A protein has these predicted regions:
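Catalytic beta-strand-to-alpha-helix segment of the class III nucleotidyl cyclase homology domain
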Residues: 265, 284-386
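Long, domain-scale regions corresponding to catalytic signaling modules most often appended to membrane systems
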Residues: 222-223, 385-387
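Ligand-binding pocket scaffold of soluble enzyme catalytic domains
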Residues: 1-220
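Catalytic NTP-binding/metal-coordinating core of nucleotidyl cyclase/transferase enzymes
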Residues: 219-298, 302-303
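Short linear capping/connector segments at secondary-structure termini
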Residues: 126-130, 145, 278-283, 316, ...
């Protein structure tokens, strides 16, 4: 068994800025590498379930199974996700944490809200106040709360192929059901008697969770080699390439394209991108994290500008099929269509990419709703702005 404290919690160092899901996913992989664990069953609770879902979809070859307790797919309220915290509640909570963290009256109120069944237990209240005061400074508490609220993996749930067990309290029935409905073959078990946040501290209730986990894990057989993976797809295209080639002639254009390709490949290597194809003057590549893909797109754009070239870039995160070392599936043409909709010098991304880098500090400008040729539905697109 491997236990580790997420950034900003427990014995891990305080966070200077809110880590993204992608950064925290890298932490999971680093811990597994350090422990020489090639594959593992991931057990995560509450907002940590979003991290586990993203890891399982991105690294299916390293995930034997998932066990999620009171899972959440999104931290903030949305019309189709009414169980999450509203913007108003979130802002009020951030203000209270910033202004009142460490205050006994505030922490007592918070303890009674989180664990109403223990509201009159003076020993529990004393412990909770002691625990919260020593767990984080006000600034660290704000960062941790922001980390818990930001991030949205609703579009990733269907990409999880690992056997999945969801354990939940009765109060979380609908939210857990939402997650279970979107993970193929997921098993849902309601644990009666778990009324609030700190019920898990009850040894009897905790034993129930452990028993259900053991029963599920013992029944997980050999996991086949995955043929699908969550990836961020990148497409680039040189703006005005035909006119430029005609203006400078074929020999000069070939030399310029060679320098362009070298520049792109250098940035792909720097940001752990995988080159999948080149078509004329464009590149098709994949990444295991959307934040790295955006950073790489910006770097490519600046690098080729030194050659007097302007590009457009499109990014989309989705489930892909592995085909003889290549990636296929609807996510690939979707990424290509996003790139086609980008303006000169623009890094255009789908809403899925934007949701997955929440908390990164990356700024986006809304580019409206688009129909992408050959792709069902309409798509909200955003330009990633390099500050």
């Amino acid at each position: 068994m491997i236990l580790f404290d997420k950034r900003g919690s427990g014995l891990s160092d305080p966070v200077r800025q809110v880590p993204t899901l992608e950064t925290r996913m890298d932490d999971v992989r680093a811990v597994m590498d350090a422990a020489r664990s090639e594959r593992a069953v991931l057990w995560a609770g509450h907002e940590g379930s979003r991290l586990a879902v993203l890891f399982a979809a991105t690294y299916p070859e390293r995930t034997n199974a998932l066990v999620l307790y009171d899972p959440t797919a999104r931290g903030l309220w949305a019309p189709d996700y009414p169980w999450a915290t509203t913007d108003e509640e979130w802002l009020r909570e951030l203000r209270d944490i910033r202004e009142r963290w460490g205050d006994r009256d505030y922490l007592t109120e918070r303890a009674r809200w989180m664990s109403p069944s223990l509201a009159e237990d003076d020993a529990f209240i004393d412990w909770f106040v002691w625990y919260m005061r020593r767990s984080a400074s006000p600034a660290e508490a704000v960062s941790f709360y922001r980390m818990a609220m930001e991030g949205d993996v609703r579009e990733v749930l269907s990409a999880v192929r690992a056997p999945t067990l969801l354990l939940h309290r009765p109060a979380k029935r609908e939210e857990a059901g939402y997650v279970a409905d979107r993970i193929a073959g997921a098993r849902l078990i309601e644990i009666g008697g778990l009324r609030d946040w700190f019920s898990w501290a009850d040894p009897q209730r905790n034993a129930i969770l452990l028993r259900e986990t053991e029963r599920f894990v013992s029944g997980v057989g050999a996991v086949p080699e995955p043929d699908r993976v969550l990836a961020t797809i990148l497409f680039t295209d040189i703006v005005g390439s035909t006119e430029r080639a005609a203006a400078i002639g074929d020999p000069a254009w070939r030399g310029l394209i060679e320098r362009h390709h070298a520049a792109v490949r250098g940035e792909l290597a720097r940001f752990r991108g995988v080159e999948l194809d080149t078509s004329g003057d464009g590149f098709f590549a994949s990444f295991d994290g959307p934040g790295r893909a955006i950073a790489c797109a910006w770097a490519i754009r600046e690098s080729v500008r030194t050659l007097g070239l302007e590009i457009r870039v499109g990014l989309h995160t989705g489930e892909c099929e592995r085909l003889d070392g290549k990636l296929g599936g609807i996510a690939v043409p979707t990424g290509a269509r996003v790139a086609a909709a980008a303006g000169p010098g623009e890094v255009l991304v789908s809403s899925t990419v934007k949701d997955l880098v929440a908390g990164s500090g990356i700024e986006f400008e809304d580019r409206g709703v688009h129909g992408l040729k050959g792709i069902p539905g309409t798509w909200q697109l955003y330009a990633a702005i390099d500050a």
